[in-house]
């Protein structure tokens, strides 16, 4: 009765191992079932009864799991369980002939596996290869084989591939006594470490004795049998010293070691001690040197990718960057430190090669079009070098630098008058007060000519025409106040003739007297239009100098 109550505690494991699903039985449950068979005779009978009842179910999954458990117990179960299984082998033989309708998913494969496993169990039950009770090791003894320091004759934990070609382990009485002895030794070791050491392993544990932890050295190594002195590795504490006031291990005996046995770090500390400094100054000097080296190494390693990117952009066969190169450069800047890249581009503007300068300025223009850096920051970095380039000789470098400065002026809107670019073609002091962004495209002289009014107001051109028209046609030369003769310009003669021709043939227009502005398209006709207006306004200007009268179809309105 007590065995059955104890068996009920193992029922969850049995239900898990024989569940009706596709999941295989976990491997650790096979060992648990073997332990149940060794607990008592009643537990062994209850286990066999439960497994045979589960074998009678109609599910092939349950049958297959039960047969695999029985096959495992044939090799690792108790002798009592194997003997009872032989008496009830009819259930196994019945499972060896099982068949049924095919499964929708697996077909008849499950039935084949069940039959093969059942036939294997029957063959192992009645064969001579089954280990005898005297050679069988209990599960409790196998579980204690890994605790503490076991004897050399202790059996190893064998799996399914265990072969019988092992030495004789003795009878069950000796095995039981050996298990009790190993358990006692394990308990003694856990309570009193180092007690109960056997003499057989004394020599093996001699080399495993505790040794103080030592820092490995590349130049020298201690002998295997001798342990390092603990005083040489014990640090000395000083209050008020950076780093907690702890000296390194080589600072205490640095004066006693030979120069050949010292590491480079200890040699640097010895040099500091010979110069008259104490241990505190040596530590401070060593820390400062380490920090400097570390900062320099980090700086160089951090800027390598930026320098490589700038080198790829500035060094090329073409003078200007292609669209693909500009996009690739901006994409690379977004992944790296943009400020460092821009400073390197600024340094490239001082190069002697014009190609490098132009490619650098193209890269700067690409960064201006992106939002990686602010325009104020970019202008503050490259302003001086760009102004230097604009003051250089005429050429593409000067034009490109001028264009970039004008772009910065329009983007930042706070560019001072001192930084504005001065034109060589406009020496008047009023031209540099405000800059035109498109001055490079359309010259300033052409723009002023195209925007000339076609109205009647008095102009130098009109006065010259009237003066020339009053002279005879044969007078080609004039006298200056100094008495010298000056030959008239052929263009002026053409302008006079055109004016005379228009004055004789007057055409009335609806748009006379209106303020007209010449268009940008017909720049070659502006002189003709101007002459026509000038010719029409000669005689009315003499009648009323204050208010010129025009010949128009709307003249009747002036009453």
Curated annotation (Swiss-Prot):
GO (cellular component) term, any one: cytosol
Chief site of localization: Golgi
UniProt-annotated stretches for the region Disordered: 131-157, 214-290, 472-491
Comp. bias (Polar residues): 472-485
Subcellular localization, as worded in the UniProt entry: Golgi apparatus, trans-Golgi network membrane; Cytoplasmic vesicle; Cytoplasm, Cytosol
Classification via Pfam families: ENTH
Membrane topology label: Peripheral membrane protein
Domain ENTH, chain residue ranges per copy: 2-135
Compositional bias segments (type: Low complexity): 144-154, 266-281
UniProt entry keywords in alphabetical sequence: Cytoplasm, Cytoplasmic vesicle, Golgi apparatus, Membrane
One of the record's GO molecular function terms: protein-containing complex binding
Function of the protein: May play a role in vesicular trafficking of proteins at the trans-Golgi network.
PANTHER family for the chain: AP-4 COMPLEX ACCESSORY SUBUNIT TEPSIN
Protein name, as recorded: AP-4 complex accessory subunit tepsin
Species the sequence originates in: Xenopus laevis
């Amino acid at each position: 009765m007590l065995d059955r109550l104890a068996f009920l505690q193992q029922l969850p494991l049995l239900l898990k191992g024989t569940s009706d699903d596709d999941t295989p039985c976990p491997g650790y449950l096979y060992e648990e079932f073997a332990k149940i068979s060794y607990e008592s005779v009643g537990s062994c009978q209850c286990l066999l009864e439960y497994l045979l009842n589960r074998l009678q179910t109609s599910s092939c999954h349950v049958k297959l799991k039960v047969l695999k458990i029985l096959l495992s117990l044939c090799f690792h179960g108790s002798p009592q369980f194997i003997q009872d299984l032989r008496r009830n082998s009819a259930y196994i033989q019945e499972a060896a002939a099982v068949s049924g309708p095919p499964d929708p998913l697996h077909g008849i494969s499950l039935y084949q596996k069940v039959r093969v496993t059942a036939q294997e169990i029957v063959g192992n039950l009645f064969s001579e290869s089954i280990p005898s009770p005297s050679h069988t090791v209990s599960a409790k003894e196998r579980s204690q084989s890994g605790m503490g320091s076991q004897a050399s004759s202790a059996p190893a934990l064998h799996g399914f591939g265990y072969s019988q070609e092992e030495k004789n382990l003795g009878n069950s009485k000796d095995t039981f006594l050996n298990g009790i002895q190993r358990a006692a030794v394990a308990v003694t070791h856990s309570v009193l470490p180092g007690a109960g050491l056997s003499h057989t392993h004394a020599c093996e544990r001699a080399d495993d004795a505790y040794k103080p932890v030592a820092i490995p050295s590349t130049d020298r190594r201690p002998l295997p049998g001798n342990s390092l002195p603990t005083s040489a590795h014990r640090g000395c504490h000083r209050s008020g010293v950076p780093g907690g006031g702890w000296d390194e291990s080589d600072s205490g005996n640095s004066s006693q070691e030979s120069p050949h046995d010292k590491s480079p770090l200890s040699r640097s500390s010895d040099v500091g001690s010979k110069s008259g400094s104490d241990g505190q100054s040596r530590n401070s000097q060593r820390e400062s040197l380490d920090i400097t080296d570390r900062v320099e190494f980090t700086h160089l390693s951090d800027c390598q990718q930026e320098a490589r990117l700038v080198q790829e952009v500035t060094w090329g066969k073409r003078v200007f960057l292609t669209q693909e190169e500009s996009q690739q450069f901006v994409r690379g800047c977004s992944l790296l430190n943009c400020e460092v890249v821009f400073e390197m581009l600024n340094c490239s503007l001082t190069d002697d090669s014009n190609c490098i300068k132009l490619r650098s300025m193209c890269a700067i223009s690409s960064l201006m079009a992106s939002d990686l850096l602010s325009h104020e920051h970019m202008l503050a970095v490259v302003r001086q070098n760009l102004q230097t380039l604009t003051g250089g000789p005429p050429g593409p470098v000067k034009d490109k630098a001028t264009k970039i400065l004008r772009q910065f002026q329009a983007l930042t809107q706070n560019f001072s008058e001192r930084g504005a670019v001065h034109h060589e073609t406009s020496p008047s002091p009023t031209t540099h007060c405000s800059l035109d962004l498109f001055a490079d495209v359309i010259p300033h002289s052409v723009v002023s000519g195209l925007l000339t009014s076609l109205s009647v107001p008095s102009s130098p051109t009109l006065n010259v025409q009237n003066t020339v028209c009053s002279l005879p046609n044969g007078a080609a030369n004039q006298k200056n106040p100094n008495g010298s003769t000056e030959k008239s310009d052929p263009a002026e003669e053409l302008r006079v003739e055109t004016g005379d021709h228009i004055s004789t043939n007057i055409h009335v227009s609806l748009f006379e007297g209106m303020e007209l502005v010449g268009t940008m398209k017909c720049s070659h006709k502006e002189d003709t239009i101007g002459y026509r207006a000038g010719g029409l306004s000669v005689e009315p200007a003499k009648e009323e100098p204050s208010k010129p009268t025009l010949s128009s179809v709307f003249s009747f309105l002036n009453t």
